[in-house]
């Protein structure tokens, strides 16, 4: 771990800039969510404007795709996305034209219409689920959690905190959920101060710590507020850690194989709350969001990026690479994915880009498992990482499902302690991908 990034490199990222320089090309994947890919609505040579719908799909799990740029469609072809998959994408040559579609606000819409607006806007949660589906899981839900434990992303939206809070209220209204809990890191002093100074319906927000058995329910029983804020430890809850978020904040532990809606909880992000505000109050689809760029770049910072902008253009906006890059990782050095090309675009669930130098990249050679069970000892989800990885290595993905591979939060603890240097996280992630592919193929076959 000595060669991992130092915290001081990411500590001074209070500056948030919007990338105004147009990329030479924009790559807009027709699938930016966990579901069926959209079909392109445009053809090669077509002129598009900002906000125009580029992709539409049918089914129960969809997220429409819109153009963040004016420009010309260069091609429609398979292009790599940040996860390494080749996805059918609309490739644009952006132009300086500022023309947009007519954005129509619908501030007084009823709840059923609010859900439809969120759906039409193509808003996707940081864990890749379309927001309109997350808000209506088909189960009884009593609490909406906003995961604001990514400090640098949360800081990017503090200047528009009133809009984030209004968007969160609209999500509660659209879903019919009675109460909301905003979760901050306990050491994120800047965000805690901002939320303490914020008001909802003219009243200051209640900001309370999660201590011992005092979970969010403890405070919700004593206040009449619809929304409260809690400071919950020093953990950043990544997309794979929603079960831990529900357990640690609400005190509702989930058995293996279950998800937060099974204990009456739904999770959303800060970015989606702001996007919901933009969709309902300004009529705008989901076109851009905040991304944190850290590591071996000359000017680490948080930037507001339009979806479809290649990663290399984002890094150039941060001063370019510092030295020769060894690895570029999207969405965190532990649980993220290393991209094989910086031509891959920023997409709706991108929250961060980490650049490592060659000296920082660990390239240990994997050997045979010695069955020491250290991976079992450290797994926070009480899984058998070594066993799941072995099954994945043999292509036995049904067995991986039986061993609850989908419950892995990809924290990396097992890989860190493994004396055989097995690529446990990569193998388990591969098994999860194959399991989800089988699920999607089954869904497509039945529709």
UniProtKB/Swiss-Prot annotation:
GO terms for cellular component: plasma membrane. Its cofactor is [4Fe-4S] cluster. GO terms for biological process: electron transport chain. It is found in: Cell membrane. Residues 359-389, 399-430 form the 4Fe-4S ferredoxin-type domain. [4Fe-4S] cluster 2 binds at residues 379, 408, 411, 414. Signal peptide: none annotated. InterPro entries: 4Fe4S_Fe-S-bd (IPR017896), 4Fe4S_Fe_S_CS (IPR017900), Ion_transpt_RnfC/RsxC (IPR010208), Ion_transpt_RnfC_Methano (IPR049684), Nuo51_FMN-bd (IPR011538), Nuo51_FMN-bd_sf (IPR037225), RnfC_N (IPR026902), Soluble_ligand-bd (IPR019554). It comes from the Archaea. Its EC number is 7.2.1.-. [4Fe-4S] cluster 1 binds at residues 369, 372, 375, 418. The Rnf complex is probably composed of eight subunits, including RnfA, RnfB, RnfC, RnfD, RnfE and RnfG. This is Ion-translocating oxidoreductase complex subunit C.
